[in-house]
Amino acid sequence: MNKKSLWKLILILAIPCIIGFMPAPAGLSELAWVLFGIYLAAIVGLVIKPFPEPVVLLIAVAASMVVVGNLSDGAFKTTAVLSGYSSGTTWLVFSAFTLSAAFVTTGLGKRIAYLLIGKIGNTTLGLGYVTVFLDLVLAPATPSNTARAGGIVLPIINSVAVALGSEPEKSPRRVGHYLMMSIYMVTKTTSYMFFTAMAGNILALKMINDILHLQISWGGWALAAGLPGIIMLLVTPLVIYTMYPPEIKKVDNKTIAKAGLAELGPMKIREKMLLGVFVLALLGWIFSKSLGVDESTVAIVVMATMLLLGIVTWEDVVKNKGGWNTLIWYGGIIGLSSLLSKVKFFEWLAEVFKNNLAFDGHGNVAFFVIIFLSIIVRYFFASGSAYIVAMLPVFAMLANVSGAPLMLTALALLFSNSYGGMVTHYGGAAGPVIFGVGYNDIKSWWLVGAVLTILTFLVHITLGVWWWNMLIGWNML
């Protein structure tokens, strides 16, 4: 371990120790106070990363089990800390990662991309919309926007940029600068449009459910995000194109698409089966209530079906590093969060807010302030998941005691987590991957990100709120 990592480790170990030696605040049990210290240390660990996320959470889980065993007086078993690993939410994420990996291993993701390039990629603006349609098609089945944007969309679009004579060092503004920003800004929009488009969505909804006791189905989420999301997908490539127009306008898309499809060859049986399974997965998630199952059940059935049909092999599942990493840290953070809820930490936090913050009955003002703050603080987080575990419970409790409309605030918070990450090139793991290709500078990236973030915010608090109220009135949320 190097010196820098050692200091990071000392910091996250010091946090629960310091909090543990301090007396618990009035109204909060000693168990809840010490568990909060461990949870806070886990959050800091996710941000500064002395170890990979799974290691940080395993340490936090181990410490929490020791604390529960010694301070709970039998009220809770140590296995309560492990509840996140038995949560359907955790397995939904893992199963969706397997579906996502199948698009790469079968080549179906590439085939869809080249078909789109051949149809609408005859201009550089059209290529921007290729990123829109490709990401939108893949989003429901890809709970990692890093895998989606960085693993599927980026390699294809980058090869197109190179083919058009755009190089990071010599000619970034020819087309690469525009296309790279399009990939990132688009994926930050599609990531909030579907419950399963980003792992953080599933974690965020679980927290909203624990704190505000609101239920939102896969279909309800997609309907709520659909109108503002589609509007932003339509304008995003155009806004980037207007602010930083590429030097070339026309593209020989037919040649590029033909070469790409020729390399892939005829559509294979695995691709056809995957396409069928993908459609069935979407139908299952949309009509899960009518079918009498939940979203997690659909995801696990899909994974089992892909293994049964040979679309993916068990070796493919084992090699899916992103899925296993997420399973470990995700299950850990859900378990810790659920335990904090059980020991009434969030109830205590609500009372603190209620006694110290007042909007004097102006619930709509509270709604505006909470959502605006949720975007501003994203400047300080390089991880959407770290933001969720650190700030979402705070904003949710603030909404609960301020008189803000709860369903509207919940939806706005669930969506702002993703688009708030537009503001910087480190606002999500996909950012460093795309920015690292070398076509973009920080100034232009941050400027475009700020403009699109503000525009998205305005769309959500105007047309979005109107649309959500309509859905609530129709009993569709």
Swiss-Prot record:
InterPro entries: CitT-rel (IPR030676), SLC13A/DASS (IPR001898)
Alphabetical keyword list: Cell inner membrane, Cell membrane, Membrane, Transmembrane, Transmembrane helix, Transport
Membrane-spanning intervals of the chain: 6-26, 28-48, 51-71, 88-108, 149-169, 220-240, 273-293, 298-318, 357-377, 379-399, 446-466
Coarse class of the protein's main subcellular location: membrane
PANTHER family xrefs: DICARBOXYLATE TRANSPORTER 2.1, CHLOROPLASTIC
Membrane topology category: Multi-pass membrane protein
Lineage: Bacteria, Pseudomonadati, Pseudomonadota, Gammaproteobacteria, Enterobacterales
NCBIfam families found in the cross-reference section: dass (TIGR00785)
Protein name per UniProt: Inner membrane protein YbhI
GO molecular function: transmembrane transporter activity
Protein family according to the UniProt entry: Belongs to the SLC13A/DASS transporter (TC 2.A.47) family. DIT1 subfamily.
Subcellular location: Cell inner membrane
GO cellular component, as recorded: plasma membrane
Organism: Escherichia coli (strain K12)
Residues in the Periplasmic compartment per record: 27, 72-87, 170-219, 294-297, 378, 467-477
Side Cytoplasmic, residues: 1-5, 49-50, 109-148, 241-272, 319-356, 400-445
Claim: Cell membrane is one of the keywords in the record: yes
